[in-house]
UniProtKB/Swiss-Prot annotation:
This is Synaptic plasticity regulator PANTS. Keywords: Secreted, Synapse. The lineage of its organism: Eukaryota, Metazoa, Chordata, Craniata, Vertebrata. Its main location: other. One of its GO terms (biological process) is regulation of synaptic plasticity. It comes from Danio rerio (Zebrafish).
Amino acid sequence: MAGSQAQWRPPRSCDIYCSELKHCKSLRNRFHEYYTYGRAPDCQQWKQDYQNCKDWEKNHSTQAKDSLQESERKRLADQRKFTPVWELRQKPPSDWHLPLNQGEPQDP
């Protein structure tokens, strides 16, 4: 079991966690998040992941490994959850084959 632990690698290198943390804390990203979502970004998870990655590289801590795995699973699950912008159609509109009235104004 100890041999399999030594071969495990974090899903991302520690440099990537560090660059994600720097990006999250950047002024440009903070402005974008505030403009888009109305709140400042929460960079705590990137910081914790970076610290866990460094801890794994130094000590091969099982707690750091489990924390990184759980964080990545949560991150992937959050990416899969989204609200579709458009309502998906089950069938095409009934008048899809008719020509468009480009010269005439449409009724409101």
